[in-house]
């Protein structure tokens, strides 16, 4: 677990690559991992909070409350219809487990997978599905959520403020680095500002 104020070294996944990952996991019948990736992305929860989430918390729910292990704060999380449907479909495919079970767990022991085991498995998926990412870990999905929200927003400033609140970061700058807005992204933004030449202005 990262210390407070210290950013993790994981990267975000471009949304197209994330969707390809889900398709691959479903095709290969790795349903528990499809579920993990889906919930981790859709809720932007840390892995410790995903691991403690039970079926009864999310199955058929429009929203739910989750007390974060790290911050001790309670988050209210809304789920889109498509997210609810995905969870319900996977619940049936996985044999309709006991609703008191963690959504991510070992079938035999009914114990949640450890974070270390999840990270080891994700590294295998990075290779298997040829994902364009160097540092792939449990934190990737939280960052992918952030980058997706930012890229989809018309007002980038509002998106950063919103993400800053969701992630509970100390500054907007921290949020920018967290979702992968590095110097080259900022350079590109500045260079998008162009003036007409005097000749062009006169001809108009």
Labelled PLM ranges:
Residues 52-85:
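Conserved tyrosine-mediated DNA breakage-rejoining catalytic core shared by Y-recombinases
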Residues 49-51, 146, 154-168:
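Active-site-proximal segment of tyrosine recombinases
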Residues 1-12, 194-204:
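C-terminal secondary-structure termini that scaffold catalytic or DNA-interacting sites
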């Amino acid at each position: 677990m990262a210390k407070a104020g210290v950013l993790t070294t994981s990267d975000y996944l471009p949304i197209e690559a994330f969707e390809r990952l889900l398709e691959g996991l479903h095709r290969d019948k790795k349903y528990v991992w499809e579920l993990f990736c889906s919930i981790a992305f859709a809720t932007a929860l840390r892995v410790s909070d995903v691991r403690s989430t039970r079926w009864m918390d999310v199955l058929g729910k429009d929203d739910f409350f989750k007390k974060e292990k790290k911050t001790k704060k309670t988050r209210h999380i809304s789920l889109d219809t498509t997210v609810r449907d995905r969870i319900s479909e996977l619940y049936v495919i996985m044999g309709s487990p006991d609703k008191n079970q963690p959504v991510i767990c070992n079938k035999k022991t009914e114990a949640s997978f450890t974070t270390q085991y999840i990270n080891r498995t994700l590294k295998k998926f990075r290779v298997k599905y040829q994902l364009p990412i160097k540092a792939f870990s449990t934190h990737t999905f939280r960052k992918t959520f952030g980058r997706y929200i930012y890229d989809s927003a018309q007002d980038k400033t509002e998106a950063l403020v919103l993400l800053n609140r969701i992630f509970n970061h100390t500054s907007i700058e921290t949020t920018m680095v967290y979702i992968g807005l590095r110097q080259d992204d900022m350079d590109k933004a500045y260079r998008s500002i162009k003036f007409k030449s005097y000749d062009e202005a006169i001809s108009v």
